[in-house]
């Protein structure tokens, strides 16, 4: 089976339909680590509080510790239905709190029994799985009996099997990539007969890849017929929606900014036309002249990531590279190092292009433009998340790049202007 390899590449009707207004606030309990004393400043349109959802006291206490007071618009629409066990299909742009919808909903419904797995969360990369596990840890901090484990390829499967067969270490919540989870099912090492919640995050990426979809179908068949199914993504094409709904029964469908505008709150977007040979000098100039907390620089291949990172380090820039060709443990260690602010600059392939939440990133640079417009959304969405400001700059070095830039502007009805010669005022993209 090659789904693990697919992850490595990473360039890989009676339902109720609700269109949430595109001016929804960009905050709420989402997937980034926030200091406990830092209060979320964005308020939902209806000023609903999390207490209105009648969540468990333990959950409300954890939400309060994170500094969240009001749910985002997506959370206001989804959570009241999802905590009742309704199937959910949700598409909303980055930073609107989709992760917290399924984390809070599944924890609300969870009644932990030793040795029984009741919640299954599938995602397409190891970093995202690791991050979701951390979200469960944050929101279940006052639920000491709840155990969550993450399973992904690149480490010996024997360790996973050992955890699963011991009632004391077997988790109630499993977060996993499709390849490793399918392997555990094939080995009969994991029992899914008690699963009550089946979640796929970034579901379009999981279900568009044929190998991953087959794995998910096999896993799905090993779970009970009666269960809740929830799927989430920042992009859901008209073609993939029917595929998602085949797993569901009369789902609540939420489409925010339905294939329309790229309106990432507070994100300034520019492009720079230059030749390939000019990219390194211009990048160094930008890193010297721009103010930023952390920056992520996207390139199109692992070899370019390594070479650019070497160049930056040699030029005394605090840089680190993260890409899918690295050994698994090193990749996770580098991700953690960047997230914990040990490095301010990260050079990455699209392994960081979807779902990864690092709150301090407020500058995203496309050293190489992506091939697809949707991938641009996921990349630049790393900056300006959670109601913060941000800046995105794309290098345009070829006719093909110009065509992609046109597609991005057309696809999302957004005007991306040329980066001014005099630069930009830091107050437009830096939080004061």
Curated annotation (Swiss-Prot):
SUPFAM superfamilies given in the database record: P-loop containing nucleoside triphosphate hydrolases
Functional summary from the UniProt entry: ATP-binding RNA helicase involved in transcription elongation and required for the export of mRNA out of the nucleus. SUB2 also plays a role in pre-mRNA splicing and spliceosome assembly. May be involved in rDNA and telomeric silencing, and maintenance of genome integrity.
Positions of region (Disordered): 1-35
InterPro entries (UniProt xref): DEAD/DEAH_box_helicase_dom, Helicase_ATP-bd, Helicase_C-like, P-loop_NTPase, RNA_helicase_DEAD_Q_motif
Motif (Q motif): 48-76
Protein family: Belongs to the DEAD box helicase family. DECD subfamily.
Pfam families attached to this UniProt entry: DEAD, Helicase_C
Catalyzed reactions: ATP + H2O = ADP + phosphate + H(+)
Top-level division of the source organism's lineage: Eukaryota
Sequence ranges of Acidic residues compositional bias: 1-17
Subcellular location: Nucleus
Stretch forming the signal peptide: none
Binding sites annotated in the UniProt record for ATP: 92-99
Keywords: ATP-binding, Helicase, Hydrolase, mRNA processing, mRNA splicing, mRNA transport, Nucleotide-binding, Nucleus, RNA-binding, Spliceosome, Transport
All copies of domain Helicase ATP-binding, residue ranges: 79-254
UniProt xrefs under CDD domains: DEADc_DDX39, SF2_C_DEAD
Gene Ontology annotations of biological process type: mRNA processing; mRNA transport; RNA splicing
GO MF annotations in UniProt: ATP binding; ATP hydrolysis activity; RNA binding; RNA helicase activity
Motif DEAD box, chain ranges: 201-204
GO cellular component: spliceosomal complex
Principal subcellular localization: nucleus
Written domain comment of the UniProt record: The Q motif is unique to and characteristic of the DEAD box family of RNA helicases and controls ATP binding and hydrolysis.
Protein name: ATP-dependent RNA helicase SUB2
